[in-house]
């Protein structure tokens, strides 16, 4: 297999529903020879041939359920045209496996751990096509355990590895916002969204913090709660992010300690090839990866058993978490691919515990990805 030389990044992340269903069904229509002269997502039977679908009744039902409420004609047409443009390249590559596009299936709203393809090829040695529209699902939404990080159940991972520094950071953040609220009694403060607010009642000497949960409490009660995250604490996280440039020194001791702890642990864990392969979503079968940056062919996991971690660099924190840059390569290559690994508050700082997200894969040709178009 010849790997082409190119320098591009593959970025993923964000909300997925509308973009996901429009892009996936549009690609399915393009490769299944659908009649698009009068496509109606509420009546897909009239456009998509039943004999091209592995489970036609179930697929039609899923399209009506998932695409209809999210249908965007312009977005759908964009991806349909992209599918048509890449159809020949897909068939040319399938010919290497003595295959061609035949019957297909659709994952629907399910994320399949054992299959990277959103649109699957029935009876083929190639799994299908993984479609990643802008705002689509990340390469891997992982638990911290996937990086070798093992916090106690229910604990914030930053708290687990640096308890004193974590509590000190949150205490400073909480104190600043509480003082700001006290200076403006009765005034609702919403640093980010009006869904997450704080207001001080001067007569009761208490604060009301509103989020997905609400509390009314005095200053000591609030400050004594810094060890655990909670939905009502989102307003403090929003305030810190809004004031990151001025207040980032509050996080320096925490992030300095975490960087040392995480870098060693993650690097040791990722030296295991299976951890790398799972993170990069290599699968038992090869598959196509289609995004706004082009069409790629991703080899099977058996073809990248020699993939190795060359190093792990610590990135610059952005106020929501930690960034690490993994450098990956094949043994016969001096050039490396780079992968950004975020341990971050993706669902609201201090509202929920951090998650691990893998994003921005740069120079994927150095780990076996082949660019086709």
Task: Name the predicted role of every residue range.
Residues 1-10:
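Short acidic, low-complexity intrinsically disordered linear motifs used
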Residues 9-117, 121-373:
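Short, positively charged
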């Amino acid at each position: 297999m010849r790997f082409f030389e190119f320098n591009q990044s593959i970025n993923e992340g964000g909300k997925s529903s509308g973009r996901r269903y429009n892009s996936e069904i549009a690609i399915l229509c393009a490769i299944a020879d659908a009649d698009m002269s009068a496509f109606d997502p509420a009546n897909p039977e009239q456009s998509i041939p039943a004999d091209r679908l592995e489970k036609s009744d179930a697929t039609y039902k899923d399209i009506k359920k998932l695409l209809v409420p999210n249908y965007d004609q312009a977005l759908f047409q964009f991806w349909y045209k992209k599918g048509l443009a890449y159809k020949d390249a897909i068939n040319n590559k399938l010919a290497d496996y003595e295959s061609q596009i035949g019957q297909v299936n659709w994952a629907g709203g399910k994320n399949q751990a054992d299959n990277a393809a959103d649109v699957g090829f029935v009876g083929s040695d190639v799994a299908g096509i993984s479609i990643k529209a802008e705002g689509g699902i990340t390469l891997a939404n992982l638990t911290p355990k996937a990086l070798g990080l093992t916090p106690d159940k229910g604990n914030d991972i930053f708290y687990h590895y640096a308890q004193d520094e974590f509590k000190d950071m949150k205490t400073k953040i909480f104190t600043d916002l509480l003082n700001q609220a006290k200076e403006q009694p009765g005034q609702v403060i919403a640093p980010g969204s009006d869904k997450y607010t704080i207001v001080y009642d001067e007569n009761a000497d208490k604060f009301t913090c509103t989020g997905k949960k609400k509390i009314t409490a005095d200053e000591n009660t609030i400050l004594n709660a810094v060890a655990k995250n909670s939905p009502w604490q989102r307003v403090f996280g929003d305030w810190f992010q809004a004031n990151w440039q001025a207040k980032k020194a509050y996080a320096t001791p925490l992030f300095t300690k975490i960087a040392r702890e995480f870098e060693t642990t993650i690097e040791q864990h990722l030296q295991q090839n299976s951890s790398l392969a799972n993170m990069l979503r290599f699968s038992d079968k090869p598959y196509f990866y289609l995004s706004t940056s082009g069409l790629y062919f991703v080899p099977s996991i058996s073809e990248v058993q020699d993939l190795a971690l060359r190093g792990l660099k610590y990135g610059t924190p952005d106020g929501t978490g930690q960034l690490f840059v993994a450098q990956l390569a094949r043994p016969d290559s001096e050039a490396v691919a780079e992968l950004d690994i975020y341990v971050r508050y993706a669902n609201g700082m201090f509202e929920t515990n951090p998650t691990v997200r893998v994003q921005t894969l740069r120079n994927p040709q150095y780990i076996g990805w082949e660019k086709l178009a």
